[in-house]
């Protein structure tokens, strides 16, 4: 059936059912086939057209070239074609007529057919109507192809005097290659002339593969319901379509998109019902059905994709103005559920004021979870929508709801909505799942707008990372209880993703039970107990080998050696170390925290802040560290961290203030530190420390060398020097724990290659005490090859190198080596365990050789 074929329904009058017959107005003259109408009791493979009774109805011109001019006792069909006017006057036919169409044997898809439709009734006279149409399929004559046009979706003016509150129904089937709808007009009132227009648009068509006559095709039912808007007594139809199939199984089908646009500017009560009644329907792809009401009352549109053929999804309407028919909706719903296993046979319900397939908006909550197990969206009643709009003050977007994962059950979401309704502390709430940036921004915005004491606000960081508390502390006692109950990730929003769960477990692993007690103690203890709690927290933080701030940041601690190299090469702002209260100006993270947060500097904390806070100005960090510094400043102002923490604050939380410092030309050593250090550079940094004798004069006013040592130590997995180093005069025991990683061994300096300037400052601070390498990693010293020339740095090859053949004396040795290698391979194949051992032994030898020559493996 071609999509551009024009057709028009006409309406007859009967006490209960008032069907109509579509006509085709395209006029083409090829050789054609004959379509016969014969009276049958029930519709079989082909369509059933219910014809009107003896009463008459006067209708105006419909659409296109088709006119309906009925008179008393007859039904006149007038079709205007290019050849002329064809009029057919027939009496009423109260029965059902069978319409079969037989195509020609051979042809192409663009072939044309001419049809002669004959209306045959056994009790009345015979009349025929010749209609031509363009078809896109010509099938085998053995297969009876039901042929139906596409209905026009324009409503027409109807004379109200001759329509005494009677229902009208068009009952064709939904057949192959066509789109036909059922129409039911309950209490059809007058439409204003000239303002009718298209209220329904059928987009696309559904095409099925060639099916036999034994397979019953599905039906599409479009039920039109009347509402009475205010101030204007005119009906506006809102569609509710149900998709019912027969008991046969069929291939992949696609339900077309039906879009309803109200052109009269009246508020509809949009009901969209998608009912898939056959569980044998294999893969029914139901596209999105949209109802677009006008923006008069601000009603929001809902879209609902359905992916399971055994579901019944109902999107309840916006609250209409005058609907006294809502009393019968639960009864209709019960009748609908009983008829779900068989196709819709009739729409004959004279006593009901509602269409057959509809649902109650309030009973949607009481559906079991099994009905909603496969839903990709969430059905929400008008009360929830109105409540959310009143609370949010913003538009409720259904696209955010459709992004909810499928494992969220409907009663859980409704309980969440009621919790939100009760909680007056939150001003905005987004019911979405997934780590979208917009959701996080809305969360931060909602928590910033809260009123209360600054110590009552808990960290946003934990909320973003998945610990998710239900309310903000300090707003009410109930919010505090919710926050105490929900730090384990049981937030009312959707389930967190896997990486959030892993990140939460990793950051709770080192802290243990302190993480729960920390949040509650932050809310209840005042600032005057800061000093005692800090003294209690010092030994606990010293026992922690891996601080949890690495996991609280936006990255995880790398597990492989190569990942550690890459991480330290970009120098992502690590914690600065642990607190040591000594008399010299060692920069410790705890002392810096007491200075910036508690406003209670310890001994020597003035020099602490000046030395540490200037480090980003020297360019020791990558260019993205200023952004992290700004984020740290904003987060430190928002959060007001309580001093009663039992662990180090997260990385990036320190408020860094850039101070004026004379040595701003230090980043000149950065290009050498980005790549693996050459032997010449290592020779200058390790063997000749007196070359940096000019640096201590510029660096000594603020004394950053011990600061850099603590920074280097904190950047490593186990910081050894931050808790033991005392000042610029670094002693030999401290140097023995840190300097072998920085100076003597070859592979590890690559690991700390971004700290080249820190290493230089450390060596210049202890320039008179060149440390002897205590226990190097290999048995070969670094000084053995440090002064050797680098052959790949200079090109001294004059020509191509010609290899010399081995001599006769070397030949037996070479053959013996080959035989030994072959024997080793054979043994490895025969004995896998010894082969693996041999592989490890050989790799150990190779590692030793590579470490001797300075290659980090």
UniProtKB/Swiss-Prot annotation:
This is Uncharacterized protein C2orf78 homolog. Pfam families: DUF4629 (PF15442). Residues 324-339, 518-534, 630-640, 809-828 have a biased composition (Basic and acidic residues). The lineage of its organism: Eukaryota, Metazoa, Chordata, Craniata, Vertebrata. Residues 683-700, 726-738 have a biased composition (Polar residues). Residues 316-339, 484-561, 619-777, 809-836 are annotated as: Disordered. Residues 708-725 have a biased composition (Low complexity). The gene is Gm5592. It comes from the Eukaryota.
């Amino acid at each position: 059936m071609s999509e551009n074929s024009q057709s028009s329904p006409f309406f007859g009058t009967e006490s209960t059912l008032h069907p109509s017959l579509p006509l085709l107005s395209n006029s083409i003259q090829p050789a054609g086939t004959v379509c016969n109408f014969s009276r049958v009791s029930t519709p079989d493979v082909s369509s059933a057209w219910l014809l009107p009774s003896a009463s008459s109805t006067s209708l105006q011109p419909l659409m296109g070239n088709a006119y309906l001019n009925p008179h008393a006792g007859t039904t006149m069909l007038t079709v205007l074609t290019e050849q002329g006017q064809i009029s057919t006057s027939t009496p009423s036919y109260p029965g059902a007529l069978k319409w079969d169409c037989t195509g020609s044997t051979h042809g192409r898809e663009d072939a044309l057919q001419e049809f002669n439709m004959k209306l045959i009734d056994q009790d009345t006279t015979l009349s025929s109507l010749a209609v031509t149409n363009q078809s896109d399929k010509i099938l085998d004559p053995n297969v009876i192809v039901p042929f139906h046009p596409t209905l026009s979706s324009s409503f027409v003016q109807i004379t109200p005097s001759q329509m005494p509150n009677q229902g009208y129904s068009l009952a064709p089937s939904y057949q192959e290659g066509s789109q036909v709808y059922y129409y039911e007009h309950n209490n059809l009132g007058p439409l204003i002339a000239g303002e009718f227009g298209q209220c329904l648009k059928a987009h696309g068509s559904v095409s099925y593969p060639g099916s036999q006559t034994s397979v019953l095709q599905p039906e599409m039912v479009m039920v039109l319901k009347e509402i009475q808007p205010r101030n204007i007594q005119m009906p506006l139809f809102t569609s509710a379509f149900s998709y019912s199939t027969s008991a046969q199984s069929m291939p992949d089908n696609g339900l077309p998109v039906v879009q309803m646009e109200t052109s009269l500017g009246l508020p509809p009560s949009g009901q969209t019902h998608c009912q898939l009644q056959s569980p044998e329907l294999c893969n029914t792809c139901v596209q999105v059905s949209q109802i677009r009401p006008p923006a008069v009352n601000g009603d929001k549109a809902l879209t609902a994709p359905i992916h399971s053929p055994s579901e019944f999804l109902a999107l309840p309407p916006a609250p209409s103005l005058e609907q006294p028919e809502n009393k019968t909706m639960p009864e209709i719903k019960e009748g609908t559920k009983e008829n779900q296993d068989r196709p819709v046979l009739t729409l004959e319900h004279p006593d009901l004021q509602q269409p057959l397939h509809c649902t109650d908006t309030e009973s949607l909550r009481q559906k079991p979870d099994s009905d909603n197990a496969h839903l990709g969206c969430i059905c929400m009643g008008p009360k929830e929508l109105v409540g959310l709009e009143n609370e949010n003050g913003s538009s409720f977007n259904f696209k955010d709801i459709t992004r909810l994962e499928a494992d969220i059950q409907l009663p859980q979401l409704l309980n969440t909505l009621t919790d939100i309704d009760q909680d007056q502390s939150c001003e905005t709430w987004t019911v979405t799942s997934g780590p979208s940036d917009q959701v996080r921004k809305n969360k931060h915005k909602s928590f910033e707008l809260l009123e209360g004491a600054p110590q009552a606000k808990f960290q946003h960081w934990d909320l973003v990372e998945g610990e998710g508390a239900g309310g903000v502390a300090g707003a009410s006692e109930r919010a505090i209880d919710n926050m105490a109950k929900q730090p384990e990730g049981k937030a009312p929003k959707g389930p967190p993703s896997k990486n959030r769960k892993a990140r939460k477990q990793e950051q709770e692993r080192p802290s243990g039970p302190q993480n729960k007690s920390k949040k509650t103690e932050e809310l209840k203890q005042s600032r005057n107990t800061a000093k005692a709690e800090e003294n209690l927290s010092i030994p606990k933080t010293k026992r922690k080998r891996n601080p949890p701030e690495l996991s609280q940041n936006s990255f995880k601690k790398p597990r492989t050696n190569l990942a550690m190299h890459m991480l330290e090469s970009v120098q992502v702002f690590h914690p600065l170390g642990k607190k040591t209260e000594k008399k010299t100006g060692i920069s410790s993270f705890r002392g810096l925290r007491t200075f910036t947060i508690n406003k209670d500097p310890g001994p020597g904390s003035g020099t602490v802040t000046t030395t540490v806070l200037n480090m980003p100005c020297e360019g020791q960090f990558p260019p993205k560290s200023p952004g992290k510094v700004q984020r740290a400043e904003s987060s430190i102002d928002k959060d007001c961290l309580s001093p009663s923490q039992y662990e180090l604050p997260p990385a990036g939380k320190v408020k860094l203030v850039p101070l004026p410092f004379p040595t701003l030309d230090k980043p000149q050593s950065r290009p050498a530190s980005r790549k693996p250090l050459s032997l010449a550079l290592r020779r200058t940094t390790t063997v000749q420390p007196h070359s940096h004798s000019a640096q201590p004069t510029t660096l000594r006013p603020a004394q950053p060398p011990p600061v850099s040592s603590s920074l280097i130590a904190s950047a490593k997995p186990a910081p050894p020097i931050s808790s033991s180093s005392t000042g610029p005069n670094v002693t030999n025991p401290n140097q023995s724990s840190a300097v072998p990683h920085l100076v003597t061994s070859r592979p590890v300096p690559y690991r700390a290659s971004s700290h080249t300037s820190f290493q230089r400052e450390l060596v210049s601070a202890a320039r008179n005490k060149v440390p002897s390498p205590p226990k190097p990693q290999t048995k070969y010293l670094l000084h053995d090859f440090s002064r050797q020339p680098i052959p790949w740095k200079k090109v001294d090859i004059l020509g191509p190198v010609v290899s010399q053949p081995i001599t006769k004396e070397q030949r037996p040795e070479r053959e013996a080596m080959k035989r030994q290698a072959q024997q080793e391979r054979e043994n490895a194949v025969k004995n896998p365990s010894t082969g693996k051992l041999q592989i490890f032994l050989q790799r150990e030898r190779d590692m030793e050789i590579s470490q001797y020559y300075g290659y980090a493996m």
